[in-house]
């Protein structure tokens, strides 16, 4: 398998081709961590869909939760007060009007389900929102462990706990997302995180959909676990790994289900060196190496047109020209999400 490298704007693009099955359908994704600006107003749909439509043809947009301030971590409790029954990161009353507006413009929509942090709606003894509702499993209250007593020599100063200090101040720590709005994560072994995506899909009735588990859920969470309980036409997910640079060659995706989803995607959480993007068996890792006809993306999925382009990168960050140039390179080479070719960007 030949792996040509293209240099563009200080970045390297890895292209791994395989058979085509569907016509190209680029996707524009509304960022799930949008700042509290006009990303969710209907006026944005009216004013900007014409900018995207000529550039990307039959664009498909994903919707996203209500705005959350980046300095406040996950969605704060007052944000979810509009509809506790349907809100889960994002809620139906926010999502459906946007989708209807896009449908009125002839634009297809995918619901973007991002499992990030659980909303901590209960305070601990310090007055910090870091206790989860009982229905999500045991509450995570920081500090989790008391300081161990040690025999100290006379005059030896007592050591303090770094975790306790950072949690008390509201800064980022194991169970805190900053600004005193801590939202401890739930482990992937719990049944609630694995059951949430299909429940959200059924309640909003918006197939197809995409689920992106937070890395802290662990590698036990798989797309097949969600797909087995849904009937959507397209199901994608991510298989997260750890570490800043994966030094070892990536391995194939574990075959944890006898009936895999119709369309899946795997992507590492951190960067993989270009020369290591080939498994021990000589094939590409993950879903592409295992079942190419069922894969929709490979390594990365934003700002490459494969298949997502982030809304905030395109409009808010002023990267419209750079992203369009990158997409034009892919279009000239006939590289599209449905063509099954992958694109991986790393700084040169």
UniProtKB/Swiss-Prot annotation:
This is Alpha-amylase isozyme C. Its EC number is 3.2.1.1. Signal peptide: none annotated. Binds 3 Ca(2+) ions per subunit. Its cofactor is Ca(2+). Residues 126-266 are annotated as: Disordered. Residues 145-160 have a biased composition (Basic residues). It catalyses: Endohydrolysis of (1->4)-alpha-D-glucosidic linkages in polysaccharides containing three or more (1->4)-alpha-linked D-glucose units. It comes from Oryza sativa subsp. japonica. Residues 161-188, 223-266 have a biased composition (Low complexity). One of its GO terms (molecular function) is alpha-amylase activity. Belongs to the glycosyl hydrolase 13 family.
């Amino acid at each position: 398998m030949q792996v040509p490298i293209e240099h563009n704007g200080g970045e390297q693009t890895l292209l791994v081709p395989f058979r085509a099955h569907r016509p190209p359908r680029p996707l524009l994704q509304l960022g799930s961590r949008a700042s509290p600006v006009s990303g969710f107003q209907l006026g944005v749909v009216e004013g900007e869909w014409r900018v995207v439509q000529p550039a990307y043809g039959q664009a498909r947009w994903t919707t996203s939760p209500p705005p959350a301030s980046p300095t406040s971590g996950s969605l704060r409790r007052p944000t979810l007060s509009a509809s506790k029954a349907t809100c889960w990161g994002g809620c139906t009353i926010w999502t459906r009007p946007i989708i209807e507006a896009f449908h009125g413009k002839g634009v297809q929509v995918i619901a973007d389900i991002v499992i990030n942090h659980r909303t901590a709606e209960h305070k601990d003894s310090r007055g910090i929102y870091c206790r989860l509702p009982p229905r999500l499993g045991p509450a995570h209250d920081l500090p989790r462990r008391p300081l161990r007593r040690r025999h100290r020599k006379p005059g030896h100063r007592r050591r303090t706990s770094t975790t306790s200090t950072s949690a008390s101040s509201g800064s980022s720590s194991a169970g805190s997302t900053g600004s005193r709005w801590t939202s401890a994560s739930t482990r992937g072994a719990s049944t609630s995180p694995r059951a949430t995506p299909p429940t959200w899909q059924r309640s909003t009735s918006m197939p197809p959909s995409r689920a992106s588990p937070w890395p802290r859920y662990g590698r036990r969470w798989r797309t097949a676990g969600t797909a087995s309980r849904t009937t959507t036409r397209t199901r994608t997910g991510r298989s997260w790994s750890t570490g800043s640079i994966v030094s070892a060659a990536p391995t194939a995706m574990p075959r944890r289900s006898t009936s895999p989803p119709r369309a899946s995607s795997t992507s590492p959480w951190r960067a993989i060196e270009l020369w290591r993007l080939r498994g021990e068996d000589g094939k590409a890792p993950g879903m592409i190496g295992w079942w190419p006809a069922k894969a929709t993306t490979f390594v990365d999925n934003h700002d490459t047109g494969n298949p997502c382009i982030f809304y905030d990168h395109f409009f808010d960050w002023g990267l419209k020209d750079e992203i369009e140039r990158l997409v034009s390179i892919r279009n000239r080479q006939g590289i599209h999400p449905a063509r099954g070719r992958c694109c991986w960007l790393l700084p040169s």
